[in-house]
Amino acid sequence: MNERQKFTRNFSIIAHVDHGKSTLADRLLEIGLVTDKRTQKNQILDSMDIERERGITIKANNASFDYHAKDGNIYHLNLIDTPGHVDFTYEVSRSLAACEGVLLIVDASQGVEAQTLANLYLAMDLDLRIIPVINKIDLPSADIDKCKLMIEESLGLNPEEAIPISAKTGLNVQEVLEAICYLLPPPVGDVDAPLKALIYDSFFDTYMGVVAKVRLYDGRLKKGEMIHMMNIGRQFTVTEVGINRLSMVACEELQAGDVGYVVAGMKKMGDAKTGDTITHANRQTAEDVKGFKDAKPMVFAGLFPINGEDFDALVDAIEKLKLNDSALTFERENSAALGFGFRVGYLGLLHMEIVQERLEREFNLALITTAPSVKFRITTTKDEVIEVDNPSKWPDPILIGKSEEPFVKATIIAPESYVGNIMSLVIEKRGIHLDTVYLSKDKLQLTYELPLAELIFEFYDKLKSYTKGYASLDYEEVGYRDSKLVRMDILVNGEPVDALSSIVHKTKAEERGRVIIEKLKDLIPRHQFMIPLQAAIGSKVVARESISALRKNVTAKCYGGDISRKKKLLEKQKEGKKRMKQIGNVEIPQEAFLSILKTGD
């Protein structure tokens, strides 16, 4: 170990959403970089406006700074920020792979939450040194002793090492920096061995192309060298290396133990895949960096421009966004109701919301998203296995041997008083109870298995309302399970509306169909003829409503007179309406789609 490695510390901060991770990062950087309070934005590492507005971290950012410790040495600290939301677990795993240790934040008033545990397990899998930090001790509801008990019993960590702080006021934050220097191990690596570096994130720069954020495990890297990407097999010439002191600062070379960035004339994000290993083209390392999980989309939805003329702008926007979001997948799709658009794969519902918000905000587009779906698996009667994420591709029921859907293991942490509400919600969502563990005398951890399709359908919102916001949720995939799935079509005046089709569990079809049809009845304006609205599985109608016709009083000009004259006029009107119904196409207003799809119904 050389002198540089001896005084280097690579660390991450992990926490549940809203437990003060970005605020602590601000305080650490304030001490280390001495950022000017007048020009400082809160949440320094949260570079996107959406991140600051929503108070969440989406992209993994990093900052390097020097710290003069009490032992008289100057330590070089690399802080790698991690997201805390369940959708961005892949960002957390790639950031942690670049570290030797983590600060685990626990909110002094709320204690251990679901994502605290999920992120802790990721850190333990990578064998990282964990320092517990109890934040928000300035709150009146803070209970430090209870938190220490939970840290010992629920997390299995040493409560004596827990540092009580207030990131907001800066109280005890200096102690955290001292603990990083004393308790976290320095990076190990041979600077003379062949280059081995992990790409843990990347972003697109208009002038430099793709910039890869890297952690070097072995070797050295400098400008002018030819590098080889081990997973994709491509080679590039390095044009710049450097470190990130909030902004990018070029340097002579990076060496084993360093966290920095590499620019090498890479034009697209596929050239710098997250989790790939960089080595020298002429002197390659024997094996790549292990322990990395690739991100897979779990939720799929159609994305269409409200104004059809904006399609080219959407193509351009989504391709640019893909440059900064390696987890996003998309393919072109055509809908009779909504025109040209894309079928987009997301990591989860929050990821979906953020992508749409970024497209609308950064590229000034008005968009509509169809109801989210998951990837179903079908075994045909000929024993072929196909995966379907779009209702329009659902095969004819005669050809289906069996259908399966993805299940997840959901961990819910909540106060004991809300257990009844949670159980009834999970039963409603076809969940199976696996386990209950007491984290403290009034806080429980409940584990369930339930279909992912039910989880993405208003589950999180309902969980929050059933528990007055006190429950927290985390989930992981557990594979596919047999399920009785059907495609439900919505017919307006006998014509199926493709944008409203969905794949549902047989037992839920009637309930879902009724909700959509009742909404449509309120939203579609009346026509000159009666409009039947139906929810159907194949030829079987499971729910039906009718929109009554507008009626013109054709007998108004008959003053008294013969009743047969009135009958004749009414018959004539009926004939006209019959003809109109055959020719007439029902205009479904855009608002009807927006209203139905926005609620996720």
From Swiss-Prot:
Catalytic reaction list: GTP + H2O = GDP + phosphate + H(+)
**UniProt KW Manganese keyword:** no
What UniProt keywords are attached to this protein's entry?
A: Cell inner membrane, Cell membrane, GTP-binding, Hydrolase, Membrane, Nucleotide-binding, Protein biosynthesis
Record-linked PROSITE patterns? G_TR_1, G_TR_2
Q: Which NCBIfam families does UniProt cross-reference here? A: lepA, small_GTP
Family per record: Belongs to the TRAFAC class translation factor GTPase superfamily. Classic translation factor GTPase family. LepA subfamily.
Listed name of the protein = Elongation factor 4
